Amino acid sequence: MLTLKCNAQIKKYIVPASLVFVAGGFEGAMDGLQFHYDKPNQFWNPDISWTNKYRNNDPLQGKTFRGKYLVFTTDGWHLMKFGRNAFTMGAIVTAIGEKRKWWVYIVEGLSYWTINRIGFNLTYKLF
């Protein structure tokens, strides 16, 4: 019976832990692109991809589309940022509504932060 309860407790952390891990991976890719990417790729290289949000890649011609809600479709850095934010919000939403002792939030927060940093370092080192 105790084993069954422990397994149930562990299972409820798998989804949010997986989400923050993937979010960390997206953030690692963001920073890798920003600081270490040197290939001449119009979508992934931030030195040139920032122009993708403008008509004909020319800021003087104005933006490709109105607003900034689709900017994640214009370059790799913003796509990774969108993924990081989406997976982080997913992890937060999975825990809403559960009543816990105050210290459990601290332990969970530190645990998820550690898992997130592992995901970050795995992808950041790819660049």
Which residues are covered by each model-predicted region?
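Catalytic phosphate/metal-binding cores of nucleic-acid and nucleotide-processing enzymes, i.e., regions
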Residues: Q9-F127
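Bacterial Sec-dependent N-terminal signal peptides
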Residues: M1-K11
